[in-house]
């Protein structure tokens, strides 16, 4: 009827605990890096806007 998983070696072996943790750490590090860049752009962008407004006024 439906397809069943075979044990003929066609499935990927499960990752080790170390590999899973390493992958999760890399993903979290990337997220924090992106978040930090966004925050830096927001903070620095506000300072630039204020300087530009002072020049125009």
UniProtKB/Swiss-Prot annotation:
It is a single-pass membrane protein. The keyword Membrane applies. GO terms for cellular component: plasma membrane. Glycans are attached at residue 5. The chain crosses the membrane at residues 29-45. Pfam families: DVL. This is Small polypeptide DEVIL 20.
């Amino acid at each position: 009827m439906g397809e069943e998983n075979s044990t003929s070696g066609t499935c990927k072996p499960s990752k080790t605990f170390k590999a899973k943790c390493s992958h999760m750490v890399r993903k979290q590090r990337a997220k924090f890096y992106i978040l930090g860049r966004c925050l830096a752009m927001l903070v620095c962008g506000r300072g630039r806007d204020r300087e530009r407004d002072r020049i125009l006024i």
